[in-house]
Amino acid sequence: MTQYTPMIQQYLKVKADYQDAFLFFRLGDFYEMFFEDAVKAAHELEITLTSRDGGSSERIPMCGVPYHAAKNYIEQLVEKGYKVAVCEQVEDPKTAKGVVRREVVQLITPGTMMEGRTIDEKENNFLAALTHFEDGSYALACNDLTTGQNTVTLLTGSVEDILLEVYATGSKEIVVDSSFSKDELNKLTETLKMTISYEDATAIPEGLEHLVKNVSQAKLIKAVGRLFNYVIRTQKRSLDHLQPVEIYYTNQFMKIDVHSKRNLELTETLRTKEKTGSLLWLLDKTKTAMGGRMLKQWMERPLIQKERIEERLEMVETFVNDYFLREDLKEKLKEVYDLERLAGKVAFGNVNARDLLQLRRSLLQVPAILEAISLLDNAYAARLIQGADPCESLTELLGRSIQENPPLSIKDGDIIKDGYNDKLDQYRYVSKNGKTWIAELEKRERDITGIKSLKIGYNRIFGYYIEVTKANLGALPEGRYERKQTLANAERFITDELKEKETLILEAEEKIVQLEYDLFTALREEVKVFIPKLQHLAKVISELDVLQSFATVSEEEQFVKPVLTTKREIFIKDGRHPVVEKVLNGKLYVPNDCIMPENMDVFLITGPNMSGKSTYMRQLALVTVMSQIGCFVPATEAVLPVFDQIFTRIGAADDLISGQSTFMVEMLEAKNAIANASERSLILFDEIGRGTSTYDGMALAQAIIEHIHDQIGAKTLFSTHYHELTVLEDSLDQLKNVHVSAIEENGKVVFLHKIQDGAADKSYGIHVAQLAELPDSLIARAKEVLAQLEGQEEIVIPKRVEVKAQEQEVIPEPIVVKEEPIEIEETKVDNEEESQLSFFGAEQSSKKQAKPALDAKETAVLTQIKKIDLLDMTPLEAMNELYRLQKKLKKG
């Protein structure tokens, strides 16, 4: 390192502490980058890569950006997942001895960005910290530096479950300790696409202990400590806006995994990943940025406490019934800026005068808002605004201190009002009168010299001067002025009197700018005292904003207040899919009932492709979510239970599980539901089994239906193309067949989109192909093939039978299918009547079949089958075992 110049040595020393970040190294009016940083930054930012002499034999790669434009370049890098360490000159170059001292003043990362285009006003920007414990549990702490919000929770379960909870926070960066395994880190980076950062310190930093007073579990404190230590280490400044840590537990809210959230398009659409077209898009009528953020948080975690849901619903009902109250509230909310993020900027020290002006305008609306809500006869409303301080003294302070149209910069003056500070008023008097004197001097000199073009000007190099054109130099009295500068067409002069006034004016202006800056920073410190009150106000206003948003959309879309019941029953009259109905934009939407009494758990849905089966299923889920976040629902009447979880298998494979086939994804999501669902859950399965052969798919579909029906008892909508499964209605007393109706007119299919009792007679797949405008020749051939297939023997689904066991359980008799003659190696088995292949048993059910000779491999498999205890296996386990044995038979 000694071969480099002192400045490059300084750079390398600083860079050694920030190996995973771009180092923006301040040199005069530029931030420079060197070596590998320069090469990479030039590529990412599309700026010129150059080089400089650094004292070594080879020139050093270099690139740079102007300091006044650095913010834009930093945002570009952070948006791409990089970190940027900002290294400033921390001493005056004029007084420095040797190399100017430089220090990193801030490390900017995806999870610690405070402002810029990467920060959506209606999105939180969470930084996550994950701590792994020896017992297999994890603690997850999150911080939004822009608002000061802090949360923590304890997580148990599989690594995949943990990752999905991390993903649900929307964090762009996650902090872990250096002992995290490579496998765990790979899942974080590859699966969740997050920036990884490291922090080993877990003790709560000094001065922040008050933020964890309500946290007693050591595991949670460790996670919060890791988070706080990282934030302090990277930001290197006051964090007075950090709020007390909120503990939440996942079992306090309805669980909806990421797959289901995506399938249901709660906050973004499945295809475009955009808000437009999602349920959030429909429900978001909030007027404030902080209200928008709270709405999304509510949608991420619907409630499961009946009383809390009903409180919200009652407030929404109040706003729905009182149009004038709602409209007046909306008008006031329009004038309220983002109090949470304004408070964060105050604490962070990057608030400007315009921000404080916005704060004042916001606070002016608060007294009227609080008064209007206080007049409501509603316990929830009274509790909500309890302790809310309108901060009227702060409003008054800002009103007499900040100019109405201040500049963006706090270093250019013209921020503070006249009358706020006596000394500032004195300086302004001198400056103002001095300039008046300059104007009077110019007029006087014109009169004395008779030169009408004579003027007095100013520049930073020469100060004030008298300018006379060369054509008028002869008219000047001898010795009146002292020559200062010669121009091509004029001469500039000064006088002793002019220089004296200049000194007074410039000193006053310089002192004005400095004093205004000092007064503003002092004012900022006074505002800091109000941060806790502002944050409390922000929560109150955010909640009111979300509730009025629910009321507004409920009124506009003619939603109805749901009735919550402790019974396991669903009664939805004329239910609609809220987003589809909105997108239809006035076109007739066909509503559908969903009536499932306590003794009805499963709807087996059949019907044509494109008829609306998936829409009907999503509709029920969205109605449920809307109900449990406290919103009215799209129906004419709705009685609903409180669901603890929603599981879905709808639509295309989710890209979170990469490298898996559609069928494997189906099975994984089915497993998730079967393993975790309770009788208080809602399960939506669309076309389970489509990713494998017909027989395998049908067998699995039946096994899953029976397991849900017999073992779980969850309310379930199960759509299928396996029409043979509709006979299950005869053997499963809590299953009901329903179908989406369609009719044929003049050879064309007409989808009625209406749910009716009973099973569908056909799927109309070829008609859908015609709608897709497949070639006529292809359609004709498909009809020929269909006619041939329909002439063959059909698949038979037998009734369930009782099997005597120690506890007389009822288990399903094997699914059986009509088949052509079965060939096992060289031995043929001919069907005289029926030949049935058992999926759960070992014997052929047709007694008239000839018994084939078995080879050694088949005998071994048969022996294994005889040893299987079906009563001790789930249907899925039985299918897996059958699949293994089948593969064994096929080998060789």
Swiss-Prot record:
GO terms for biological process: mismatch repair. The keyword Nucleotide-binding applies. One of its GO terms (cellular component) is cytosol. Pfam families: MutS_I, MutS_II, MutS_III, MutS_IV, MutS_V. InterPro entries: DNA_mismatch_repair_MutS, DNA_mismatch_repair_MutS-lik_N, DNA_mismatch_repair_MutS/MSH, DNA_mismatch_repair_MutS_C, DNA_mismatch_repair_MutS_clamp, DNA_mismatch_repair_MutS_core, DNA_mismatch_repair_MutS_N, DNA_mismatch_repair_MutS_sf. Keywords: ATP-binding, DNA damage, DNA repair, DNA-binding, Nucleotide-binding. Gene3D superfamilies: 1.10.1420.10, DNA repair protein MutS, domain I, MutS, connector domain, P-loop containing nucleotide triphosphate hydrolases. GO terms for molecular function: ATP binding; ATP-dependent DNA damage sensor activity; damaged DNA binding; mismatched DNA binding. ATP binds at residues 607-614. It comes from the Bacteria. Coiled coil: none annotated. Belongs to the DNA mismatch repair MutS family. This protein is involved in the repair of mismatches in DNA. It is possible that it carries out the mismatch recognition step. This protein has a weak ATPase activity. PANTHER family: DNA MISMATCH REPAIR PROTEIN MSH1, MITOCHONDRIAL, DNA MISMATCH REPAIR PROTEIN MUTS FAMILY MEMBER. This is DNA mismatch repair protein MutS.
